[in-house]
A protein has these predicted regions:
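N-terminal capping/interface segment
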Residues: 6-22, 148-156
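Cysteine-centered iron-sulfur cluster-binding motifs in ferredoxin-type domains/subunits
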Residues: 20-37, 64-84
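Sparse, context-dependent recognition of short Cys/His-centered cofactor- or disulfide-binding micro-motifs
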Residues: 9-10, 14-19, 33, 55, ...
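Well-ordered, non-transmembrane segments within structured domains
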Residues: 34-35, 48, 157
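Short flanking/linker segments adjacent to small metal-binding domains or redox-active Cys/His motifs
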Residues: 77-90, 94, 113-157
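Ferredoxin-type iron-sulfur electron-transfer modules in oxidoreductases and energy-metabolism complexes
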Residues: 2-16, 39-67, 86-119
Length: 157
């Protein structure tokens, strides 16, 4: 039988700036409209909140954690009758995993792409050609100055 990891819960509370997830009464409203759950039934925001309540650190931010399957759609935020905001808990867990260096390597790759190019996926010749065929304007990246300001404020990321 696993024991509640109070130390991990305290870390999560600090990351969240509170403990709103303690108000979850496991109604499942967050799961009902979750696109990630629809395509991957193992992903379950309700279970993530339950594991957070128990402080199951390894299952939440260890290798193979399900939190990375969240699409950040905010449907759970809209549906929760208790204002638990499961997405905020999931984002906090992702931040903790990055700091603990347990995030999948692809996460750092995407962050590096955003820092260097301002996008998560580089524009390929195929994309350029398709945009032209669809009469879409050339893709211009003119936000790097703003992005660099944002990244300079938060040096942890």
């Amino acid at each position: 039988m696993k024991k509640i990891n109070y130390e991990f819960r305290e870390r999560l509370n600090k990351e969240l700036g509170g403990f709103s997830y303690n108000y979850c009464y496991q109604c499942g409203a967050c799961v009902g409209d979750c696109p990630a759950h629809r395509f991957l039934p193992e992903f379950n925001p309700r279970n993530i909140i339950l594991k957070a309540l128990y402080g199951f650190e390894e299952e939440l931010i260890g290798e193979g954690s399900m939190i990375w399957n969240c699409t950040n759609c905010y449907n759970c935020y809209e549906r929760c009758p208790q204002d638990v905001n499961p997405i905020e808990v999931i984002v906090a867990l992702k931040n903790m995993a990055r700091r603990d260096e347990t995030a999948p390597s692809g996460v750092d790759y995407v962050i590096d792409k955003v820092k260097s190019k301002g996008v998560t996926v580089a524009e390929t010749e195929l994309i350029k050609r398709r945009r032209k065929e669809l009469n879409l304007p050339e893709f211009k990246m003119d936000c790097m100055e703003d992005l660099n300001k944002i990244f300079s404020i938060n040096k942890d990321n």
